[in-house]
Amino acid sequence: MKELIKVIAFDADDTLWSNEPFFQEIEKQYTDLLKPYGTSEDISAALFQTEMNNLKYLGYGAKAFTISMVETALHVSGQKISGTDIQHIIELGKSLLKMPIELFPGVKETLKVLKEKGKYKLVVATKGDLLDQENKLGRSGLASYFDHIEVMSDKTEKE
């Protein structure tokens, strides 16, 4: 069976490195900023609904999340949110594009061993924004281990 395996593909976010905790922290700061307009739970629910509505147009990633945060802020505030607060939201979103890459334990060592064996093609197959994912891979220090990088707008069974 081992001889049949020629390619090993890895997801990136929350497989090779931690990602979701950064989004959760930004969402907490976002809901704190919008407290004058509702509870954290209500604002989070509104943000989630906006993200789901925008998914087919914007896809996944920090940029789509940022646009959804701005849209939700305008909605929950009845268009009353200040320009200063909108700028703060944009800065929250930009911070996701610069977040530190924290590899999960053993990732680099595992990839090194697999690469050195030379028996497998190693691939990253992940969803999200192309530029953001390429930048994260570069910041991770893992790019040299992979033979191919595939960033798609969504991962479905047919893809």
Regions found by a protein language model. Give the residues of each.
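Short, well-ordered alpha-helix to beta-strand connector turns
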Residues: 5, 146-147
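Substrate-recognition element of Asp-dependent hydrolases with the DxDx(T/V) motif
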Residues: 84-92, 96-103, 107-140, 149-155
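A conserved mid-domain beta-alpha-beta active-site/ligand-binding segment of alpha/beta enzyme cores
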Residues: 159
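Conserved H-loop
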Residues: 143
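An amphipathic alpha-helix signature
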Residues: 23-31, 66, 70, 130
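Active-site neighborhood of HAD-like aspartate-dependent phosphohydrolases
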Residues: 1-46
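A metal-dependent, Asp-based hydrolase signature
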Residues: 36, 48-95
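Receiver (REC) domain switch/active-site residues of two-component response regulators
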Residues: 13, 147-148
